[in-house]
Swiss-Prot record:
InterPro entries: KH_dom, KH_dom_type_1, KH_dom_type_1_sf. Residues 35-99, 138-210, 311-380, 394-455, 535-599 form the KH domain. Keywords: Nucleus, Repeat, RNA-binding. It comes from the Eukaryota. GO terms for cellular component: nucleus. CDD domains: KH-I_HEN4_like_rpt5, KH-I_PEPPER_rpt1_like. SUPFAM superfamilies: Eukaryotic type KH-domain (KH-domain type I). Gene3D superfamilies: K Homology domain, type 1. GO terms for molecular function: RNA binding. Residues 1-26 are annotated as: Disordered. Its main location: nucleus. This is KH domain-containing protein At4g18375.
Amino acid sequence: MVERKKRKQIQRNNSESNRNQKRRISHDKINRDELVVYRILCPIDVVGGVIGKSGKVINAIRHNTKAKIKVFDQLHGCSQRVITIYCSVKEKQEEIGFTKSENEPLCCAQDALLKVYDAIVASDEENNTKTNVDRDDNKECRLLVPFSQSSSLIGKAGENIKRIRRRTRASVKVVSKDVSDPSHVCAMEYDNVVVISGEPESVKQALFAVSAIMYKINPRENIPLDSTSQDVPAASVIVPSDLSNSVYPQTGFYSNQDHILQQGAGVPSYFNALSVSDFQGYAETAANPVPVFASSLPVTHGFGGSSRSEELVFKVLCPLCNIMRVIGKGGSTIKRIREASGSCIEVNDSRTKCGDDECVIIVTATESPDDMKSMAVEAVLLLQEYINDEDAENVKMQLLVSSKVIGCVIGKSGSVINEIRKRTNANICISKGKKDDLVEVSGEVSSVRDALIQIVLRLREDVLGDKDSVATRKPPARTDNCSFLSGSSNAGYTLPSFMSSMASTSGFHGYGSFPAGDNVLGSTGPYSYGRLPSSSALEILIPAHAMSKVMGKGGGNLENIRRISGAMIEISASKTSHGDHIALLSGTLEQMRCAENLVQAFVMST
């Protein structure tokens, strides 16, 4: 009897073990299902047609293909939105072709990818019809592809990508991520951008071939499928390598110990220490907080910055003889400018009061005070390249500015406009009108572009700036001691001397040699200088030993500081026996603060 009970107990244990083993096998089989992920970029001006009213279009694609599709929100400064398409595949096909067979997608995710591309093309053509833009026969498609899949796509000695080009007759390029390209902002650090262009059918065939290779090759990178990971942009700020440990934790990327930025060092007091948890997505762990200098990095929306945004509208005049260069064949040029800048650009072919030989280009951009780059500035600069002749040494740009806000460009007694003239060497003339005033900027290309940046940024500051706080903000006190970080926690900077003598040297009307007639604005208009930042320029002393670090190889570091901050930076010749230099910063308060902090970060790394 005892043996029978033991035998029954053993049988019962074996049956339970078998059941658990079956569950584990079933669970492992589910986990072994391979994930196929595609990420296609959709221009922001056509994404509405891809989603459809109440999600009708995108939901229909989900229903018909059974694939998972997520449309992520637009990142600030990005001209594209990411559409992620994925599905699970139990057994992948061993043999795949490079040409699309009708109704034979390799998986439901690839089927959905092709249908999403069709929706993008249809929405783009619908927009062109509404705006009366000539139809462009060539189409373009962009995919985000990780490094591991990109290498397989290219193949040995470019064999695979050459075969795709030859069979589909489409242009297929694998482009590395460019932080200066607005369409690459949404790409991860490990991403390349695959650009496919050509005739519609050729692009679709090439898209099938590229996605077929991605179907066969599993990525080694961990591609996030949730919006929280996707919405964290990659760091686009270039900081000195000596400071990298203070910004990033030691997780294998930066292993060197930083002996400069220890507690007790002469660090300016406004460098607020933060923990890595404030930068989620940049680090693997954030258990141990490390000092992160917040003010050395530009504040971007989403990391505690202001969420308030306003719509900016700029009117640019273009001669009728050059308007086709701006639009391009089938609207290709203006479409490219829209995508590169992220702005909405419309051409109004109605004649202006300035003359019958000009038309108005309207640039509209929704921006926040915390945006790192201005979409409006990018659009105006890109338009300048096409409005003027390519080989012209001297160019001219004309803006229509509302009479209500022109004061922020002129300044009190013309102080601001004269300073822009002085700093950029551009000829700037403002003619008065009933509603809009004509701002004409002429001179060398570099001078005109610098002047346009200053004018557009001041108009932007007038719209986005906090008028209450700006009006009550006081300029920093002037000091004759310019010692920089010499045992003190305060940065040594002074107000430049030209600010005090600006009004007396600019003439009565503030326009120098420009006459103040009925059609030219003088100093008598009701312009409020209180809406401008209190300080329009700032001087920083750069020690001689830190000059090479601030400049960088070939001036690369200084150029990055200019690009990131948006401020104008001029380095004057050495005026002291120690070989120190003066950096003159000009721009809005936020731009100067950002540039100042970046310069100081490089100085501290020496």
